[in-house]
């Protein structure tokens, strides 16, 4: 299976070197005085930008000096992914950090959390509440079930990430531990905890997960993906 495009040291450097920001939206009443930094956007009586740059502007607010601050991060090093040009279906409430790759016609459902450096193949669905940790790789036409966790590895930097092959189905609430590889065509049963590599075209289940059978025609029918859900 392929290596992640960003290794752990590159991600660590990216985070360490990034300017830490506290992004805010400020709605104010009154008149601002003084020049507005280029990195702060003003639309009517609303400011968008880093709190450290907006705070001094509010000190010069005249008249009633009333304002409301909305924020969802503090000293954040990694912004959220700009999703505007991604050729995939991404539902509201998914949290996807920058430096994530998402293939064509992938589906990211509500509440999914995808950390920096993760890669999602074309046609793969990440279901509701699933978590892909840093550098986790999922191949093409796979399904990561609701509440499943693919453990991430940014530190320690020497650790290997989770790698999931093509045409894999991971059941709801399953957990795949750091460094584990799931072979293409395999099925991980719901609730399984996978601590060792899984070969291709098998079904694993249990805690810890063990091979219980080879993929057969009946299993393929029960775990078949629906292309219609991936239509844009």
Swiss-Prot record:
It holds the Pfam family DapH_N. It is an enzyme of class 2 (transferase). GO terms for molecular function: tetrahydrodipicolinate N-acetyltransferase activity. This is 2,3,4,5-tetrahydropyridine-2,6-dicarboxylate N-acetyltransferase. Pathway: Amino-acid biosynthesis; L-lysine biosynthesis via DAP pathway; LL-2,6-diaminopimelate from (S)-tetrahydrodipicolinate (acetylase route): step 1/3. Catalyzes the transfer of an acetyl group from acetyl-CoA to tetrahydrodipicolinate. It catalyses: (S)-2,3,4,5-tetrahydrodipicolinate + acetyl-CoA + H2O = L-2-acetamido-6-oxoheptanedioate + CoA. Coiled coil: none annotated. The keyword Lipid biosynthesis does not apply. Belongs to the transferase hexapeptide repeat family. DapH subfamily. The keyword Acyltransferase applies. PROSITE patterns: HEXAPEP_TRANSFERASES (PS00101). HAMAP family: DapH. Keywords: Acyltransferase, Amino-acid biosynthesis, Diaminopimelate biosynthesis, Lysine biosynthesis, Repeat, Transferase. One of its GO terms (biological process) is diaminopimelate biosynthetic process. The lineage of its organism: Bacteria, Bacillati, Bacillota, Bacilli, Lactobacillales. Its EC number is 2.3.1.89. InterPro entries: DapH, DapH_N, Hexapep, Hexapep_transf_CS, Trans_hexapeptide_repeat, Trimer_LpxA-like_sf.
